Amino acid sequence: MNIQALLSEKVRQAMIAAGAPADCEPQVRQSAKVQFGDYQANGMMAVAKKLGMAPRQLAEQVLTHLDLNGIASKVEIAGPGFINIFLDPAFLADHVQQALASDRLDVATPEKQTIVVDYSAPNVAKEMHVGHLRSTIIGDAAVRTLEFLGHKVIRANHVGDWGTQFGMLIAWLEKQQQENAGEMELADLEGFYRDAKKHYDEDEEFAERARNYVVKLQSGDEYFREMWRKLVDITMTQNQITYDRLNVTLTRDDVMGESLYNPMLLGIVADLKAKGLAVESEGATVVFLDEFKNKEGEPMGVIIQKKDGGYLYTTTDIACAKYRYETLHADRVLYYIDSRQHQHLMQAWAIVRKAGYVPESVPLEHHMFGMMLGKDGKPFKTRAGGTVKLADLLDEALERARRLVAEKNPDMPADELEKLANAVGIGAVKYADLSKNRTTDYIFDWDNMLAFEGNTAPYMQYAYTRVLSVFRKAEINEEQLAAAPVIIREDREAQLAARLLQFEETLTVVAREGTPHVMCAYLYDLAGLFSGFYEHCPILSAENEEVRNSRLKLAQLTAKTLKLGLDTLGIETVERM
């Protein structure tokens, strides 16, 4: 149920009947304050200006055409021409019943699209670090939301599995007589990478061999392809452990690395030349883009093939966008890549559009994000100033959560404690990130994220168990409760019901904007409203059974909404804390 969409259409029709143009925007928003109703239509100002009349006068005319019978109990004009809409308690009660009767909480399915989501993208032969966290968990929250809404989602894990470093790594493995790379741990590979790089920089003979190996690998030599595959396999096996720990839905089947697009690059460069988009410049192949200017104010040159014949990330990204449209048949492509890559992506996509590889009707969206910072406001590092490995971060989260949970539950059995600590620790790390607007940097703070107060995972998980505890105490008959009516008489009942029915609107925003923090804010607000409702509207000690059952149903929908909302974020719920 999308009340905002329903009201928007009703108000728009009334505005048109009052003389507004057919493309008018009613601007229906959820009201920020209770005294302004549940929703507010703010579109009169802009339209009245076009019509040359006072906004309040237009609002009055709109009201004469606005039929919200059975939806709103009161509609009033406020200030210069805002229309405040107060939802009818009977309407709320009816839709609470409908939500409870549906596995999907009465959330509609929009027109199905094929949506490719590019996220995580670690590098082969390197362990995942904290820099991969945001892309991985924000992208996964978007994927979960889009799938819940009924879209066909293709996860694309654009791993860095190609390039000159593979010649270097294979040469070093060979030199160490470690050809059976399958038995190596990734921790060894980290050291191998450093040692290989050191030799590559210092030993010209070794570097020459590494360069030859790259050529052999790229020409498809089976021995080198097999060594390369081992490196990829070791890395992705290790990464899968991290994905599983993070409760992220990526699997090995979702890997679409840079190597996938390599066979396309020669043809793309030739095609861009044939179309007159790419030209030779100082030995390299370049596309000049009028949309981007260099320091001299001239069109910026984007290199797609170097003098030595090598390709660049831009070339791969052009091929990648083309593949996602032509082969995967994407209707929409989302990229969860940090904000520093924005210009690079915009340039690649400008070339993609000019070449006609992806039509304008298919959005290519950069859902960029800021950095994770330490308390000092600088990029998050180890005490020694090194990069924090993601596995180490999750180990620490688990250890801190274990202490926290044991403190609160000294008699809890060990296996139960471990399960709870895992849900709380991993949930805390994820929720701390997801609850911040992705476009900004954020401070990583253990104390804040593991607190049981405020907009945190432990608070949300506890809020869920608190609602469940009502049912444990109530000893309800499920069939009896299902048949009982919902009756809304108190303001706090109405406020909670209205917020519960805004779940679909919240999902719609997350699906459109790729902003999981909107869901976090909604769930936190919902938990707060339930707390106020629980305090002021007795459930188990209600004045009669009818009121008791009605309030139990509001509690039931709260529990279902919290669980489903947290699930779209990839945050695990628990039955007891």
Curated annotation (Swiss-Prot):
Its EC number is 6.1.1.19. It is found in: Cytoplasm. This is Arginine--tRNA ligase. One of its GO terms (biological process) is arginyl-tRNA aminoacylation. Signal peptide: none annotated. It is an enzyme of class 6 (ligase). InterPro entries: aa-tRNA-synth_I_CS, Arg-tRNA-ligase, Arg-tRNA-synth_N, Arg-tRNA-synth_N_sf, ArgRS_core, DALR_anticod-bd, Rossmann-like_a/b/a_fold, tRNAsynth_Ia_anticodon-bd. It comes from the Bacteria. The keyword Nucleotide-binding applies. The keyword Transport does not apply. PANTHER family: ARGININE--TRNA LIGASE, CYTOPLASMIC, ARGINYL-TRNA SYNTHETASE. It catalyses: tRNA(Arg) + L-arginine + ATP = L-arginyl-tRNA(Arg) + AMP + diphosphate. GO terms for cellular component: cytoplasm. CDD domains: Anticodon_Ia_Arg, ArgRS_core. The gene is argS. Belongs to the class-I aminoacyl-tRNA synthetase family. SMART domains: Arg_tRNA_synt_N, DALR_1. A motif ('HIGH' region) lies at residues 122-132. GO terms for molecular function: arginine-tRNA ligase activity; ATP binding. Keywords: Aminoacyl-tRNA synthetase, ATP-binding, Cytoplasm, Ligase, Nucleotide-binding, Protein biosynthesis. Monomer.
